[in-house]
A protein has these predicted regions:
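Extended, well-ordered protein cores
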Residues: 1-244
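Long, low-complexity, intrinsically disordered segments
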Residues: 241-256
Length: 256
């Protein structure tokens, strides 16, 4: 097994420290190109997964790839290849979910927390730095105890053992209530499908989603769900006439 510095567990076997040789690692990484330009990025993502003993799994796959060549990449059920493929698919799925399930709060800067199974923060870095390039923000990973900081076009991922989100001020509470109001207003009660929602938005994400948190400062219900947020003197909303929803186009047949 491989252990990082500070993570060594008591064992009965001899432990040998391995010094990182960056030049050697670069040569090996570049050497993967002769098999496929996708091997290097694939193994990099495999390292960010939560696969148990992933370092050993990556080593066995890389050694076998050098022995057997690119034909190994066609054997998707290979005992050294398949576990990595499955782990990377799970990582990619979680990454896509967190691109949509991060909720920032304004506490002087934009702040958010995530609790992923895989180490997705390095992969989320480019997405949020590009999307929020005019902001100052940080994103804290509770699982891996690290945070992404961004300000003035510069970003860094640094270890952070503990972080407690500051309580929201009145302005932030109001924005949260507005977001919950929007979420509830666009819902079509007759078409609710809890099982489908959980398949697209698993319950483990819910505690950090603003729209699904309990609101101790909730505004009492009114005839219009968002009436409490209307500007003074604004006319009441006129309900839209009922419309019949057009059927969705059928998906094209997939290739065999």
């Amino acid at each position: 097994a491989f252990f990082r510095t500070g993570e060594l567990e008591p064992c009965l076997y001899e432990v040998r420290a391995v010094t990182t040789d960056a030049a050697h690692a670069r040569r090996v990484y570049e050497g993967f190109r002769r098999f496929s330009p996708e091997v290097g990025p694939f193994l990099r993502r495999a390292y960010w997964t939560c696969l148990p003993e992933k370092e050993l799994a990556i080593y066995h796959f890389a050694a076998k790839l050098y022995r057997e060549g690119k034909l190994l990449l066609q054997r998707l059920s290979d005992e050294t290849y398949h576990p990595l493929l499955r782990a990377v698919r799970q990582l990619n799925g979680e990454l896509e979910q967190y691109r949509g399930f991060v909720r920032f709060s304004d506490i002087g800067v934009l702040a958010a927390e995530i609790e992923p199974k895989n180490r997705v923060l390095p992969l989320l870095r480019g997405h949020f730095c590009q999307r929020c390039h005019d902001e100052t923000f940080f994103l804290y990973d509770r699982t891996h105890r690290e945070a992404l900081f961004y300000a003035d076009g510069h970003s860094a991922i640094v270890p952070l053992e503990e972080f407690v989100m500051a309580p929201p001020d009145e302005a932030e509470k109001r924005y949260r209530r507005l977001w919950r109001c929007f979420y509830d207003t666009i819902a079509i009660r007759e078409r609710e499908n809890p099982k489908l929602r959980m398949s697209h938005m698993p319950k483990r994400f819910w505690p950090l989603l603003t729209e699904l948190q309990s609101d101790p400062d909730a505004i009492p219900p009114s005839p219009s769900p968002c009436a409490a947020f209307a500007a003074p003197g604004a006319p009441a909303a006129i309900p839209a006439p009922a419309t019949r929803q057009a059927p969705a186009p059928s998906a094209p047949a997939s290739a065999p």
